[in-house]
Amino acid sequence: MQTLRRQAAWPCVPRGTLEVDFPPPLYSDDYLSQEGPRWTPAIKQATRWKYTPMGRDAAGQLWYTGLTNSDSREAWYTLPRAPDSPYREAYARWHGCYGHRERSLPSAYTQRLRETAWYDPIIPAQYTDPSTRWGSVLWKDRPIRGKEFAINRHRFGVEALWRASDYVRYLSAPQRPRYTAQNYRQWGLEPYCPATNQRPPPVYTPSH
């Protein structure tokens, strides 16, 4: 009886008693808090504390990051949270471990430090250096063959190539292969195979 009273006064349930003394039912939707590793890299800071369902839903759960969903209650920094806790436990633990790193770095780098936990390229980050970034990826304009996009590429030949802004390397005329122009009215009516470079025999048409 003394042991049961002592266990009831504990603020949390020991991990050893989750499955042994109080085994949950097999098909249960109850959420049990599982403690993760204590010393993990910063990139795994958001996965340390999570409510994991036991039973048929234990395979994999959709866990919102708080960046792309509208419901802020499902964000990672709000889980897990005790019903009587006035603060976010997971964020407080993370901030206590990495707060001294943020104070010693510029503001732009602290945002990069926070982005390492949940990479979301939809939200562009602000950095002190002038190079263009999108999310946490450095944006570089590299000419990729065949991947360029021009708004009025179908109007090639209207203006000179050296003055046209829609000139695409390897794809604009005269580099564009035969019978690949967008204007199909300029194609020949005779069938042609570009792979074998074969043309059909000419059809005899009597002239009057």
Swiss-Prot record:
Matches recorded under Pfam families: TKTI1
InterPro entries from the UniProt entry: TKTI1 (IPR029203)
Any one of the GO BP annotations: flagellated sperm motility
Location(s), subcellular: Cytoplasm, Cytoskeleton, Cilium axoneme; Cytoplasm, Cytoskeleton, Flagellum axoneme
UniProt keyword terms in alphabetical order: Cell projection, Cilium, Cytoplasm, Cytoskeleton, Flagellum
UniProt key word Cytoplasm: yes
Known tissue expression: Expressed in trachea multiciliated cells.
A GO term from the CC aspect: axonemal microtubule
Self-association and partners: Microtubule inner protein component of sperm flagellar doublet microtubules.
Function as written in the Swiss-Prot or TrEMBL entry: Microtubule inner protein (MIP) part of the dynein-decorated doublet microtubules (DMTs) in cilia axoneme, which is required for motile cilia beating. Located at the center of the tektin bundle where may function to recruit tektins or stabilize the bundle.
Protein name stated in the entry: Tektin bundle-interacting protein 1
Annotated source species: Bos taurus (Bovine)
Lineage: Eukaryota, Metazoa, Chordata, Craniata, Vertebrata
